[in-house]
Regions:
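Juxtamembrane/interface alpha-helical elements of multi-pass membrane proteins
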Residues: 56-174, 287-296
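General structural signal for secondary-structure boundaries
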Residues: 9, 49, 92, 121, ...
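Short, charged/polar low-complexity linear motifs in solvent-exposed/disordered segments
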Residues: 32-34, 51-52, 143-145
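Membrane-helix interface segments
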Residues: 30, 49-50, 133-136
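Membrane-interface helix-boundary motifs at transmembrane edges
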Residues: 46-55
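Short, charged N-terminal helix-start/capping segments
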Residues: 34-46, 62-70, 119-122, 206
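Transmembrane alpha-helix interface motif
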Residues: 2-45, 159-296
Protein backbone atom coordinates (compact mmCIF):
# COMPACT_ATOMS: atom_id res chain seq x y z
CA UNK A 1 0.00 0.00 0.00
CA UNK A 2 2.95 2.35 0.61
CA UNK A 3 3.24 5.35 2.88
CA UNK A 4 -0.07 7.21 3.16
CA UNK A 5 1.49 10.51 4.23
CA UNK A 6 3.64 10.60 1.08
CA UNK A 7 0.47 10.75 -1.01
CA UNK A 8 -0.65 14.00 0.59
CA UNK A 9 -0.14 17.32 -1.16
CA UNK A 10 3.54 18.36 -1.41
CA UNK A 11 2.78 21.52 0.59
CA UNK A 12 1.60 19.36 3.49
CA UNK A 13 4.72 17.20 3.30
CA UNK A 14 7.06 20.18 3.13
CA UNK A 15 5.35 22.07 5.96
CA UNK A 16 5.54 19.02 8.22
CA UNK A 17 9.26 18.53 7.67
CA UNK A 18 9.93 22.26 7.99
CA UNK A 19 8.22 22.23 11.40
CA UNK A 20 9.83 19.09 12.81
CA UNK A 21 13.30 20.02 11.55
CA UNK A 22 13.06 23.57 12.87
CA UNK A 23 11.77 22.55 16.29
CA UNK A 24 14.22 19.64 16.52
CA UNK A 25 17.11 22.07 16.12
CA UNK A 26 15.68 24.87 18.27
CA UNK A 27 14.07 23.05 21.21
CA UNK A 28 16.79 21.60 23.45
CA UNK A 29 14.37 20.51 26.15
CA UNK A 30 15.07 16.84 27.07
CA UNK A 31 11.44 15.83 26.59
CA UNK A 32 11.27 17.55 23.18
CA UNK A 33 14.49 15.88 22.06
CA UNK A 34 13.21 12.46 23.12
CA UNK A 35 9.88 13.06 21.35
CA UNK A 36 11.60 14.19 18.15
CA UNK A 37 13.95 11.21 18.15
CA UNK A 38 11.05 8.82 18.81
CA UNK A 39 9.00 10.26 15.95
CA UNK A 40 11.97 10.17 13.58
CA UNK A 41 12.75 6.55 14.50
CA UNK A 42 9.18 5.38 13.99
CA UNK A 43 8.71 7.16 10.68
CA UNK A 44 12.13 6.18 9.34
CA UNK A 45 11.42 2.57 10.27
CA UNK A 46 8.07 2.80 8.51
CA UNK A 47 9.64 4.22 5.34
CA UNK A 48 12.96 2.41 5.19
CA UNK A 49 12.24 -0.86 6.99
CA UNK A 50 13.93 -2.30 10.04
CA UNK A 51 17.16 -3.30 8.33
CA UNK A 52 17.73 0.12 6.80
CA UNK A 53 16.83 1.77 10.11
CA UNK A 54 19.35 -0.45 11.92
CA UNK A 55 21.98 0.59 9.36
CA UNK A 56 21.25 4.27 10.01
CA UNK A 57 21.38 3.71 13.77
CA UNK A 58 24.79 2.06 13.52
CA UNK A 59 26.04 5.41 12.26
CA UNK A 60 23.88 7.72 14.38
CA UNK A 61 24.41 6.14 17.80
CA UNK A 62 28.23 6.40 17.72
CA UNK A 63 27.82 10.07 16.78
CA UNK A 64 25.56 10.55 19.82
CA UNK A 65 28.09 8.90 22.13
CA UNK A 66 30.96 10.82 20.54
CA UNK A 67 29.20 14.13 21.18
CA UNK A 68 28.60 13.13 24.80
CA UNK A 69 32.29 12.32 25.24
CA UNK A 70 33.84 15.18 23.29
CA UNK A 71 31.76 18.02 24.74
CA UNK A 72 33.00 17.60 28.36
CA UNK A 73 36.59 17.71 27.10
CA UNK A 74 36.11 21.28 25.85
CA UNK A 75 33.16 22.54 27.88
CA UNK A 76 33.79 22.69 31.62
CA UNK A 77 30.82 24.83 32.62
CA UNK A 78 28.39 23.61 35.25
CA UNK A 79 28.14 23.50 39.02
CA UNK A 80 27.91 19.73 39.52
CA UNK A 81 31.56 18.67 39.45
CA UNK A 82 32.04 14.91 39.18
CA UNK A 83 35.82 14.62 38.97
CA UNK A 84 38.83 16.65 37.94
CA UNK A 85 40.61 15.70 34.74
CA UNK A 86 44.40 15.24 34.63
CA UNK A 87 44.62 18.68 33.03
CA UNK A 88 43.01 20.18 36.13
CA UNK A 89 39.73 21.05 34.42
CA UNK A 90 36.52 19.83 36.05
CA UNK A 91 34.25 17.22 34.49
CA UNK A 92 30.71 18.40 35.16
CA UNK A 93 27.38 16.62 34.92
CA UNK A 94 25.90 19.52 32.97
CA UNK A 95 28.51 19.29 30.21
CA UNK A 96 27.91 15.54 29.81
CA UNK A 97 24.14 15.99 29.62
CA UNK A 98 24.51 18.85 27.16
CA UNK A 99 26.67 16.63 24.96
CA UNK A 100 24.02 13.90 25.10
CA UNK A 101 21.35 16.46 24.20
CA UNK A 102 23.38 17.76 21.26
CA UNK A 103 24.00 14.21 20.04
CA UNK A 104 20.31 13.35 20.36
CA UNK A 105 19.39 16.47 18.41
CA UNK A 106 21.87 15.57 15.67
CA UNK A 107 20.55 11.99 15.42
CA UNK A 108 16.95 13.19 15.24
CA UNK A 109 17.76 15.74 12.52
CA UNK A 110 19.65 13.16 10.46
CA UNK A 111 16.76 10.69 10.68
CA UNK A 112 14.24 13.38 9.77
CA UNK A 113 16.34 14.21 6.70
CA UNK A 114 16.32 10.51 5.78
CA UNK A 115 12.53 10.65 5.83
CA UNK A 116 12.60 13.98 3.97
CA UNK A 117 14.58 12.49 1.10
CA UNK A 118 12.12 9.62 0.79
CA UNK A 119 8.95 11.75 0.88
CA UNK A 120 9.97 15.02 -0.81
CA UNK A 121 10.93 13.81 -4.26
CA UNK A 122 12.52 16.04 -6.88
CA UNK A 123 9.22 16.53 -8.74
CA UNK A 124 7.52 17.66 -5.52
CA UNK A 125 10.32 20.12 -4.83
CA UNK A 126 10.17 21.56 -8.35
CA UNK A 127 6.37 21.78 -8.07
CA UNK A 128 6.63 23.80 -4.85
CA UNK A 129 9.40 26.20 -5.84
CA UNK A 130 9.67 25.95 -9.63
CA UNK A 131 7.73 29.16 -10.28
CA UNK A 132 9.14 31.15 -7.38
CA UNK A 133 12.84 30.31 -7.67
CA UNK A 134 13.18 28.16 -10.81
CA UNK A 135 16.98 28.07 -11.04
CA UNK A 136 17.54 27.46 -7.33
CA UNK A 137 14.76 24.88 -7.12
CA UNK A 138 16.33 22.94 -10.00
CA UNK A 139 19.74 23.00 -8.31
CA UNK A 140 18.29 21.92 -4.95
CA UNK A 141 16.21 19.15 -6.49
CA UNK A 142 19.28 17.84 -8.31
CA UNK A 143 21.24 18.02 -5.06
CA UNK A 144 18.60 16.11 -3.10
CA UNK A 145 18.50 13.28 -5.60
CA UNK A 146 22.25 13.26 -6.25
CA UNK A 147 23.35 11.10 -3.31
CA UNK A 148 20.97 8.14 -3.85
CA UNK A 149 21.46 8.38 -7.62
CA UNK A 150 25.24 8.51 -7.16
CA UNK A 151 25.15 5.41 -4.94
CA UNK A 152 23.13 3.42 -7.48
CA UNK A 153 25.42 4.46 -10.33
CA UNK A 154 28.50 3.64 -8.24
CA UNK A 155 27.19 0.13 -7.63
CA UNK A 156 26.55 -0.27 -11.37
CA UNK A 157 30.09 0.85 -12.21
CA UNK A 158 31.61 -1.41 -9.55
CA UNK A 159 29.74 -4.42 -10.91
CA UNK A 160 30.82 -3.58 -14.46
CA UNK A 161 34.46 -3.28 -13.37
CA UNK A 162 34.17 -6.55 -11.47
CA UNK A 163 32.91 -8.34 -14.59
CA UNK A 164 35.98 -7.28 -16.58
CA UNK A 165 38.39 -8.24 -13.77
CA UNK A 166 39.11 -4.75 -12.45
CA UNK A 167 37.46 -4.92 -9.06
CA UNK A 168 38.96 -2.50 -6.53
CA UNK A 169 38.79 -5.08 -3.73
CA UNK A 170 41.22 -7.58 -5.29
CA UNK A 171 44.85 -7.50 -6.37
CA UNK A 172 47.87 -5.78 -4.88
CA UNK A 173 47.69 -2.49 -3.04
CA UNK A 174 48.90 -0.61 -6.12
CA UNK A 175 46.31 -2.33 -8.35
CA UNK A 176 43.48 -1.65 -5.89
CA UNK A 177 44.48 2.02 -5.69
CA UNK A 178 44.60 2.38 -9.49
CA UNK A 179 41.23 0.67 -9.92
CA UNK A 180 39.66 2.80 -7.19
CA UNK A 181 40.96 5.95 -8.90
CA UNK A 182 39.53 4.71 -12.20
CA UNK A 183 36.11 4.14 -10.65
CA UNK A 184 36.25 7.57 -9.02
CA UNK A 185 37.17 9.19 -12.35
CA UNK A 186 34.26 7.42 -14.05
CA UNK A 187 31.84 8.62 -11.38
CA UNK A 188 33.04 12.24 -11.56
CA UNK A 189 32.67 12.22 -15.35
CA UNK A 190 29.21 10.70 -15.08
CA UNK A 191 28.10 13.26 -12.47
CA UNK A 192 29.24 16.20 -14.61
CA UNK A 193 27.64 14.82 -17.76
CA UNK A 194 24.40 14.08 -15.94
CA UNK A 195 24.24 17.62 -14.53
CA UNK A 196 24.87 19.19 -17.95
CA UNK A 197 22.31 16.96 -19.67
CA UNK A 198 19.68 17.74 -17.03
CA UNK A 199 20.31 21.49 -17.29
CA UNK A 200 20.18 21.42 -21.10
CA UNK A 201 16.99 19.35 -21.04
CA UNK A 202 15.24 21.74 -18.67
CA UNK A 203 16.41 24.76 -20.66
CA UNK A 204 15.17 23.28 -23.95
CA UNK A 205 11.75 22.79 -22.37
CA UNK A 206 11.55 26.43 -21.39
CA UNK A 207 12.02 25.86 -17.67
CA UNK A 208 12.18 29.16 -15.82
CA UNK A 209 10.70 31.27 -18.61
CA UNK A 210 8.05 33.79 -17.65
CA UNK A 211 4.53 32.66 -18.48
CA UNK A 212 5.50 29.02 -18.92
CA UNK A 213 2.69 26.65 -17.93
CA UNK A 214 3.22 23.22 -16.43
CA UNK A 215 1.07 20.17 -15.87
CA UNK A 216 0.72 19.05 -12.27
CA UNK A 217 -0.71 15.85 -10.84
CA UNK A 218 -1.14 17.41 -7.40
CA UNK A 219 -4.52 18.71 -6.31
CA UNK A 220 -5.44 20.21 -2.96
CA UNK A 221 -8.10 17.92 -1.47
CA UNK A 222 -10.12 18.23 1.73
CA UNK A 223 -7.76 15.96 3.63
CA UNK A 224 -4.85 18.21 2.63
CA UNK A 225 -6.69 21.27 3.94
CA UNK A 226 -7.39 19.53 7.24
CA UNK A 227 -3.75 18.47 7.47
CA UNK A 228 -2.56 22.03 6.78
CA UNK A 229 -4.88 23.32 9.50
CA UNK A 230 -3.56 20.74 11.94
CA UNK A 231 0.08 21.48 11.14
CA UNK A 232 -0.56 25.22 11.38
CA UNK A 233 -2.19 24.76 14.79
CA UNK A 234 0.71 22.66 16.07
CA UNK A 235 3.31 25.08 14.75
CA UNK A 236 1.64 28.14 16.27
CA UNK A 237 0.91 26.39 19.58
CA UNK A 238 4.52 25.30 19.96
CA UNK A 239 5.76 28.74 18.95
CA UNK A 240 3.57 30.35 21.60
CA UNK A 241 4.76 27.79 24.13
CA UNK A 242 8.39 28.49 23.34
CA UNK A 243 7.92 32.27 23.56
CA UNK A 244 5.98 31.90 26.82
CA UNK A 245 8.78 29.85 28.39
CA UNK A 246 6.90 26.57 28.55
CA UNK A 247 9.62 24.76 26.61
CA UNK A 248 12.66 26.51 28.05
CA UNK A 249 15.51 24.45 29.43
CA UNK A 250 18.95 25.49 30.67
CA UNK A 251 21.95 23.21 30.98
CA UNK A 252 24.30 25.83 32.39
CA UNK A 253 25.19 26.73 35.02
CA UNK A 254 22.74 24.17 36.39
CA UNK A 255 19.89 22.05 35.05
CA UNK A 256 16.66 23.98 35.27
CA UNK A 257 13.53 24.63 33.28
CA UNK A 258 9.89 23.71 32.89
CA UNK A 259 9.30 20.00 33.28
CA UNK A 260 6.07 18.66 34.83
CA UNK A 261 3.84 21.72 34.93
CA UNK A 262 0.41 21.30 33.28
CA UNK A 263 1.27 24.26 31.05
CA UNK A 264 4.35 22.45 29.72
CA UNK A 265 2.73 19.01 29.48
CA UNK A 266 0.23 20.35 26.95
CA UNK A 267 3.12 21.45 24.72
CA UNK A 268 4.79 18.04 25.04
CA UNK A 269 1.59 16.31 23.95
CA UNK A 270 1.11 18.63 20.97
CA UNK A 271 4.74 18.13 19.93
CA UNK A 272 4.33 14.36 20.26
CA UNK A 273 1.20 14.47 18.11
CA UNK A 274 3.03 16.58 15.52
CA UNK A 275 6.00 14.22 15.28
CA UNK A 276 3.75 11.16 15.07
CA UNK A 277 1.40 12.66 12.47
CA UNK A 278 2.74 10.60 9.51
CA UNK A 279 2.71 7.40 11.56
CA UNK A 280 -0.85 8.03 12.77
CA UNK A 281 -2.02 8.78 9.22
CA UNK A 282 -0.42 5.61 7.92
CA UNK A 283 -1.89 3.44 10.70
CA UNK A 284 -5.33 4.93 10.11
CA UNK A 285 -5.03 4.30 6.37
CA UNK A 286 -3.93 0.71 6.99
CA UNK A 287 -6.88 0.12 9.32
CA UNK A 288 -9.33 1.47 6.74
CA UNK A 289 -7.68 -0.68 4.08
CA UNK A 290 -8.05 -3.81 6.22
CA UNK A 291 -11.65 -3.08 7.17
CA UNK A 292 -12.87 -2.17 3.67
CA UNK A 293 -12.90 -5.76 2.25
CA UNK A 294 -15.00 -6.95 5.20
CA UNK A 295 -17.70 -4.42 4.29
CA UNK A 296 -17.95 -5.50 0.67
Amino acid sequence: MGDAFSRYHPLVNFLFFALVLAYSMVLMHPVCLAVSLLGALLYAGQLEGRRALARHLRVALPVLLLAALVNPAFNHAGVTILIYLPSGNPLTLESILYGLAAGTMLCAVVLWFVCFNRVITSDKFVYLFGRVIPALSLVLSMTLRFVPLFRRQLETVRQAQFCIGRDASTGSAWQRARRAVTIFSIMVTWALENAIETADSMKSRGYGLRGRTAFSIYRMEDRDKYALGWLGFCGMYLLCGSLAGGLKWWYFPMLQGAMAQPFSISFYLVYLALCLTPVIIDRKEARVWRCSPSKL
